[in-house]
Amino acid sequence: MKTLIARHKAGEHIGICSVCSAHPLVIEAALAFDRNSTRKVLIEATSNQVNQFGGYTGMTPADFREFVFAIADKVGFARERIILGGDHLGPNCWQQENADAAMEKSVELVKAYVRAGFSKIHLDASMSCADDSIPLAPETVAERAAVLCLAAESVATDCQREQLNYVIGTEVPVPGGEASAIQSVHITQVEDAANTLRTHQKAFIARGLAEALTRVIAIVVQPGVEFDHSNIIHYQAQEAQALAQWIEKTKMVYEAHSTDYQTQTAYRELVRDHFAILKVGPALTFALREAIFALAQIEQELIAPENRSRCLAVIEDVMLDEPQYWKKYYRTGFNDSLLDIRYSLSDRIRYYWPHSRIKNSVETMMVNLEGVDIPLGMISQYLPKQFERIQSGELSAIPHQLIMDKIYDVLRAYRYGCAE
């Protein structure tokens, strides 16, 4: 990461896409996509997804590292080319607890990530806890971030410190996605970004962390990109020029969250304007969902009724029976809920792929389709871009490859934006 940031600050057009997903097919796609390049791949876990108690994936940071490395070994991607990051490390998961208890858990969270070899650490203590004011004072946020940084430094080996990098600050939306429709977004003001940096510098120095400050490579801001269930707010470069000019006076770059669904031109403009770390998550699993839905439609036409996976029906049944991951985000009417469950850009389905019933139905569908020849006309109907690549000899009509290539479509846009 340090080399990439140095190259960007030296004037090169270079950025990096941060893959924020724990889905094995998404991670496989991210690694396979860059297998034959010289680029490193940045894969990040969030604090609610992976933590010392297992998170919603059931994985600790060490478990997640081994999970990613096993996929890398399978696809032939060198482990040393993987950068592991921890996103929103702080009280995010424990906001319902008092601040002291939440921060104790947050300290252990950061230690677990660093011990597991994660080298990009987002110190985010911006969330109010049960006994806090809303919003927190910037000074309190910075003081807590310094406590978390101290925790990281206390367990990092000398070798780890050479690679260790910190990201500070936070964007406006809550981690995990918008809960309601958006019409506009508040772009971070220069004075707020400057205040974030100033308060963190002061808090770090007060705790004897002056050297650790040199490891702060990025600040999270809102450049004016966001999405909800059916709306996308696109990057307007002219609106972010004050931010772009301010960061040039520092040794840092920006990290932009929720960059999913922007155009490839927007990614290039974002990197040009020093938003050099572009985070993506739901767009990748949305592409995965599109591929699985397309294959499910193909299965319905090619496979005898008694042998079908009923994949789409199973997904719907499970999500209606167990609505905890989407209920507070999606619309309330039954038909509206079904549309959001299937097609929302927020892609809450991503929380359900590990469910045993859904996992088994997808596996059945894949086995069914691997045993038949899929007519080209059907691929053209349901996966038109993949049809074109099959026609040009770049791709085979194999279900797994079709899913991979569908995810590659998202990664291709980021590569266009980030490539030197």
UniProtKB/Swiss-Prot annotation:
It comes from the Bacteria. GO terms for cellular component: plasma membrane. Pfam families: GatZ_KbaZ-like. GO terms for biological process: D-tagatose 6-phosphate catabolic process; galactitol metabolic process; phosphoenolpyruvate-dependent sugar phosphotransferase system. The keyword GTP-binding does not apply. The keyword Calcium does not apply. Belongs to the GatZ/KbaZ family. GatZ subfamily. Component of the tagatose-1,6-bisphosphate aldolase GatYZ that is required for full activity and stability of the Y subunit. Could have a chaperone-like function for the proper and stable folding of GatY. When expressed alone, GatZ does not show any aldolase activity. Is involved in the catabolism of galactitol. This is D-tagatose-1,6-bisphosphate aldolase subunit GatZ. It comes from Escherichia coli O6:K15:H31 (strain 536 / UPEC).
